């Protein structure tokens, strides 16, 4: 269910930056750690009568003991832990995190010194005209020419925001400073037509120009930036020249006094931007459109001082409130919902805390945890669409004000909407996250701390589909032809919110119940130097779509009936255009409808229905061609699709298989065949024992096999040839007649399998073949391997006799493997199959993840495939996001996030299938894991079916090892960087599959090229090798269950793992890459008879391991597979020289000197009849 993160608790310490007055003020209401003290109830203790000796002893002990009685603070902490938290661990984690994020005294001292210096410098500024400003004005608007004179500020600069409330949060500490413009800088009508914004920008540029010349700031870095990606809000960023500049940034805001303009001039229904500003004409008889969003932009400056007073009265001197806000800011930042023009900022959170305090939902003595929990609880059940207010005397009705905004949260003046730029979808997303946080806190089986505070969850990892519009011509087309004029005036012609409103309204109407939310994906604007012009931002749009799993893949959009709602039907036809048709349904109704797919389409095609709808709407409604936009959905599905090199037309099967199919679409065919075989096995009546159950344990039975399984298994010369073997476990009924000898029992099992095979042949005409692993059965082109399971075999494997002849039962590797394969894996396989039925994206996510790991040259010997399945299942089981993804591509990105940011040394991955584990069992396992960490593997996975083997069954210390885990972490981080940069950059297209699913050829010492005619190609879409170009295809079927290369590689690892590490791609790889161990393993060592493998004599009577000798040993083990050995550098040089490496069927081993070419012989002619006989040969068809 959850991941348990091991942490060490630190001793509580008091911050040295607090004054004695602060501690005295908080001691009466809250402890120093911010946790609440419940009301103390007098406890009446019963006196115990003591004997004289006991009394004297007790008195003496109290008199001489150095142990002090518990203080009130300690008693209060114990009570808090019991009343508020599930465990002491959660409280210690919260406490430790708060200690880590507290502002260090050196930063607070520097900020105090800086603000004093800045105040002195500002007061020394002299009045002057704009001509004295040598810097660029940080504004890109339709400017009006007017004279502007700089006047010295009449009030001192003030700290605002987190710096004023004591809630600064790193790692990059941003300190906001407000500098108020004098009232004399403005005239009566400056509130109209963007004049206020121009004067504000001119004033900022003049301040920057004059301060930059000051000796106190001359060494600092000066830059401009936009506050919250708002081009009307430029700020000055100063980075100190000292070492603190790496972690500290100071931003200067220009504000104005609230008295310069009447606040009533900025009511939402008033207009303050005339159409003539943008060269538009307007009919004077019509009412001017409201500019509520622009008005709110000006009110932000005018009301800043009043709102700051409220926040100071709420947070100053209250450490519990400050720490509560810090917890909320960490939670919000980890989800990246506070980014950009449309973000839910921390300022809104601080104001909401003040609102809850006004409503008496927060008490002054509330602990930091109680504050955060209360905020989450209230947010989860809130509805700001009707409006809430901080004002004690709201001048206008909230319902009227709320009609002009998506979300309404009025400030202390009652005029400024704190959420003016907040879209409804973002607000609902924050509420959903808050609801999830409360649910996690209430779940005692989950370590909610890591989920809420520690796990980074970027917003793009929650999106199922992503739409990007970055083409400048397309953006201009949308703004000029489709955006309404009143929207342009409302946002002062800022492109981003105009595009956002246009697209979200259209897509929300077209998609309806198919989407949960449509959210903007923004990136913070980058600063620019003060001597360059302000950049134009917002000329692109990236939208993320969170799909509804119940409705997203519906193939039909049904409209209103024509005879019941003629107007609605006409509007439906107009909206959908030619896609809409009149249809009759089975219930007899005749309505307009739009069909996007058929019910028999593959799941991967149905997942693209939303993509099809969006692209059609953009083309039909907005005249945007599909080539002009980027729609990111299903881009990575190609990695488990069938390679076009294999032609399904040559398959001899009754199944209808399309050429453009994939592993997911082919899996139901396998399962249907398996179900038919299971029914046939149950129908066998002449067996000595009953068949209790039949379970498929191969990955395909849980939709986790990335190789497309085609019905191509054949019988050739009484031997079954198949690309893959499907394992099936048969559980037999109880019987007391099984022998007590292990060898005899297994011989009896073999006889039982022979009898099953004979009956399958006689009754159902199925071919079978006996092998050492079980019974091979050929059915409908698929090969099944039947194994018999009986509990007595497991008991005999565990049976041991002591020296005294006592029989004991002890677990050993063989018994654990048998128990895992026969008893535990069938249950886990069934649970994973059920998980796929519940979440259709689970199986395809596993397919992509397995293909990615295989592409990094990690086979089952280095990274068990079942570990990938369980990790992905863990992602789908845990409630890390409010909505489970329906996109395998998003699931894969979350899988990469898990690999990139997991602490393998301290995390236990629990999969509590069907809630089979009790709370006590989970607690015991966690305790065992923390106390005996070294006894568990590096990657620790535990399922509810593992019994006493929990945590040690699916992985080992060598598979995967710590170096492999470290390499996978680095590879996942690099892959995430590629994905994130391509998703969020307006200039880049989404990453190509070949960039992710082809390993780098660097870092390897040797490459052993294998003969491609002996190795079958993968049926998956082949993205190439990191070492060599494509070779001739080879789709010959090997003997069933014969994977010689995997066995040889395992032999190499068993024999030479001390000296080298071996890597290859199990999905059709034709090369074996080798990395030598560190040089210390090859240093001279003393002569020992049992340590002479690959050694040669050297000086001093010592021996030394020789790499050349090891290579010869490798060749000997590889035998017929070996073609040649070379280095990656040699392969690159060959490719540069256009020399084809010998990866083809005509390869002749090691490269040899050039020889004179022999004369070509004429090809022998084969008679036509012989050719026909050869083509009709079943043996030839089976091997092709």
From Swiss-Prot:
Q: Name one GO molecular function term.
A: RNA binding
Q: Where are the transmembrane segments?
A: none
Coiled coil spans: none
User: GO biological process: what's one of them?
Assistant: rRNA processing
Annotated localization? Nucleus, Nucleolus; Chromosome
Q: Ranges of Basic and acidic residues compositional bias? A: 1-10
Which parts of this chain are annotated as the region Disordered?
Answer: 1-42, 1133-1184
Q: Which InterPro entries match?
A: NOL6/Upt22, Nrap_D1, Nrap_D2, Nrap_D3, Nrap_D4, Nrap_D5, Nrap_D6
The primary site where this protein sits is nucleus
UniProt keywords (A-Z) are: Chromosome, Nucleus, RNA-binding
Q: Which GO terms describe its cellular component?
A: condensed nuclear chromosome; CURI complex; small-subunit processome; UTP-C complex
Question: Which family, according to the similarity comment?
Answer: Belongs to the NRAP family.
Protein role: Part of the small subunit (SSU) processome, first precursor of the small eukaryotic ribosomal subunit. During the assembly of the SSU processome in the nucleolus, many ribosome biogenesis factors, an RNA chaperone and ribosomal proteins associate with the nascent pre-rRNA and work in concert to generate RNA folding, modifications, rearrangements and cleavage as well as targeted degradation of pre-ribosomal RNA by the RNA exosome.
Q: Tell me how this protein assembles.
A: Part of the small subunit (SSU) processome, composed of more than 70 proteins and the RNA chaperone small nucleolar RNA (snoRNA) U3.
Name by which UniProt lists this protein: Nucleolar protein 6
- Which species does this protein come from? Drosophila virilis (Fruit fly)
Q: Which gene encodes it?
A: Mat89Ba
């Amino acid at each position: 269910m959850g991941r348990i993160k091991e942490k060490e608790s630190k001793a509580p310490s008091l911050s040295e930056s607090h004054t004695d007055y602060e501690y005295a003020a908080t001691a009466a209401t809250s402890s120093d750690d911010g946790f609440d003290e419940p009301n103390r109830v007098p406890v009446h203790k019963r006196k115990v009568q003591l004997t004289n000796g006991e009394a004297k002893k007790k008195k003496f002990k109290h008199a001489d003991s150095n142990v002090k009685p518990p203080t009130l603070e300690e008693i209060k902490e114990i009570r808090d832990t019991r009343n508020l938290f599930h465990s002491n661990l959660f409280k210690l984690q919260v406490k430790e995190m708060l200690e880590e994020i507290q502002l260090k005294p050196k930063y607070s001292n520097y900020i105090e010194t800086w603000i004093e210096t800045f105040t002195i410098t500002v007061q020394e500024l002299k009045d002057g005209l704009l001509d004295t400003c040598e810097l660029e004005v940080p504004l890109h608007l339709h400017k009006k020419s007017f004279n502007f004179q700089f006047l010295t500020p009449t009030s001192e600069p003030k700290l605002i925001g987190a710096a004023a409330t004591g809630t600064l949060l790193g790692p990059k500490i941003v300190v906001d400073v407000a500098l108020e413009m004098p009232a004399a800088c403005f005239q009566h009508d400056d509130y109209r037509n963007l004049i206020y914004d121009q004067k504000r920008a001119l004033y900022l540029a003049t301040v920057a120009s004059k301060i930059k010349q000051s000796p106190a700031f001359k060494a600092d870095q000066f830059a401009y930036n936009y506050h919250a990606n708002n081009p009307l809000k430029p700020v000055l960023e100063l980075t100190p020249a000292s070492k603190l500049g790496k972690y500290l940034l100071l931003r200067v805001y220009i504000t104005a006094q609230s008295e310069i303009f009447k606040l009533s001039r900025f009511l939402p229904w008033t207009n303050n931007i005339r159409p003539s500003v943008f060269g538009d004409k307007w009919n004077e008889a019509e009412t001017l459109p409201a500019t509520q969003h622009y008005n709110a932009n000006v009110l932000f400056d005018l009301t800043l001082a009043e709102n700051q007073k409220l926040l100071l009265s709420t947070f100053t001197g209250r450490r519990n409130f400050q720490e509560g806000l810090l917890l909320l800011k960490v939670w919000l930042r980890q989800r990246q919902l506070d980014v950009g023009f449309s973000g839910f900022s921390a300022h809104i959170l601080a104001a909401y805390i003040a609102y809850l305090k006004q409503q008496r939902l927060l008490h002054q003595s509330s602990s930091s945890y109680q504050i955060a929990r209360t905020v989450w609880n209230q947010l989860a059940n809130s509805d700001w669409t009707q409006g809430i207010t901080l004002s004690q005397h709201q001048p206008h009705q909230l319902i009227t004000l709320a009609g002009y905004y998506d979300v309404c949260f009025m400030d202390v003046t009652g005029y400024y909407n704190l959420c003016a730029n907040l879209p409804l979808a973002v607000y609902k997303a924050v509420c959903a996250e808050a609801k999830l946080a409360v649910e996690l806190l209430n779940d005692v089986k989950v370590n909610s701390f890591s989920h809420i505070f520690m796990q980074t969850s970027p917003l793009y990892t929650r999106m199922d589909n992503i739409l990007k519009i970055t083409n400048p011509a397309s953006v201009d087309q949308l703004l000029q032809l489709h955006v309404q004029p009143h929207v342009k005036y409302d946002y002062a012609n800022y492109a981003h919110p105009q595009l956002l409103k246009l697209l979200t309204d259209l897509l929300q109407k077209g998609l309806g119940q198919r989407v949960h939310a449509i959210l903007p994906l923004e990136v913070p604007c980058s600063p620019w130097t003060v001597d360059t012009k302000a950049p134009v931002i917002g000329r692109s749009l990236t939208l993320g779509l969170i799909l509804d799993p119940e409705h997203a893949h519906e193939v039909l959009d049904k409209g209103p009936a024509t005879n019941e709602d003629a107007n609605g039907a006409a509007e439906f036809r107009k909206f959908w255009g030619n896609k809409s048709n009149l249809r009759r349904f089975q219930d007899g109704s005749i309505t307009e409808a739009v069909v996007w797919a058929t019910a028999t389409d593959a799941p991967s095609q149905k997942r693209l229905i939303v993509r099809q709808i969006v692209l059609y709407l953009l083309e039909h409604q907005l005249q945007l061609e599909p080539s002009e936009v980027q729609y990111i959905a299903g881009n990575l599905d190609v990695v488990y699709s069938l390679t076009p090199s294999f032609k399904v037309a040559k398959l001899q099967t009754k199944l209808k298989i399309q050429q453009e199919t994939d592993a997911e679409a082919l899996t139901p065919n396998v399962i249907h065949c398996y179900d038919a075989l299971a029914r046939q096995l149950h129908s066998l009546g002449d067996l000595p024992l009953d068949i209790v159950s039949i379970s498929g344990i191969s990955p395909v039975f849980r939709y986790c096999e990335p190789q497309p399984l085609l019905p191509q298994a054949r019988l050739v010369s009484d031997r079954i040839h198949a690309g893959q073997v499907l394992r099936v476990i048969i559980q037999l009924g109880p019987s007391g007649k099984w022998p007590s000898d292990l060898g005899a029992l297994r011989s009896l099992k073999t006889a039982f399998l022979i009898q099953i095979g004979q009956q399958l042949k006689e009754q159902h005409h199925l071919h079978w073949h006996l092998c050492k692993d079980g019974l091979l059965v050929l059915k409908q082109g698929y090969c099944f391997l039947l194994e018999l399971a009986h509990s007595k075999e497991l008991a005999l494997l565990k049976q041991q006799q002591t020296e005294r002849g006592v029989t004991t039962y002890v677990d050993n590797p063989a018994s654990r493997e048998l128990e895992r394969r026969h008893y535990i894996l069938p249950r886990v396989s069934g649970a994973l199959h059920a998980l796929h039925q519940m979440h259709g994206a689970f199986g395809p996510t596993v397919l992509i993840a397995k293909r990615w790991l295989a592409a990094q040259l990690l086979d089952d010997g280095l990274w068990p495939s079942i570990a990938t399945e369980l990790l992905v299942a863990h992602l789908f089981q845990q409630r890390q996001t409010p909505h489970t993804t329906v996109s395998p591509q998003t699931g894969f990105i979350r899988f990469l996030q898990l690999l990139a940011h997991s602490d393998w040394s301290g995390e236990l991955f629990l999969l509590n299938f069907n809630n089979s584990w009790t709370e006590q069992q989970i607690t015991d396992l966690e305790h065992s894991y923390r106390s005996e960490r070294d006894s568990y593997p590096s990657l620790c996975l535990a399922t509810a079916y593992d019994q006493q083997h929990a945590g040690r069954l699916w992985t080992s210390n060598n598979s995967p090892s710590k170096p492999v885990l470290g390499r996978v972490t680095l590879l996942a981080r690099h892959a995430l960087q590629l994905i994130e940069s391509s998703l969020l950059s307006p200039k880049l297209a989404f990453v190509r599959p070949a960039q992710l699913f082809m390993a780098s050829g660097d870092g390897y010492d040797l490459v052993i090229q294998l003969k491609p005619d002996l190795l079958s190609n993968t049926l998956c879409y082949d993205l190439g090798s990191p070492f060599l170009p494509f070779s001739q295809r080879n789709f010959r079927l090997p003997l069933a269950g014969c994977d010689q290369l995997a066995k040889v590689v395992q032999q190499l690892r068993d024999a030479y793992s001390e000296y080298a590490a071996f890597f290859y791609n199990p999905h059709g790889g034709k090369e074996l890459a080798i990395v030598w161990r560190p040089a210390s393993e090859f240093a001279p060592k003393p002569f020992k008879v049992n340590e002479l493998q690959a050694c040669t004599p050297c000086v001093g009577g010592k021996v030394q391991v020789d790499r050349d000798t090891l290579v010869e040993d490798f060749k000997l083990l590889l035998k017929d597979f070996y073609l040649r050995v070379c280095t990656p550098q040699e392969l690159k040089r060959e490719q540069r020289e256009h020399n084809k490496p010998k990866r083809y069927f005509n390869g002749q081993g090691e490269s040899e000197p050039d020889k004179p070419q022999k004369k070509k012989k004429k090809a022998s002619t084969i008679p036509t009849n012989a050719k026909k006989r050869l083509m009709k040969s079943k043996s030839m068809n089976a091997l092709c």
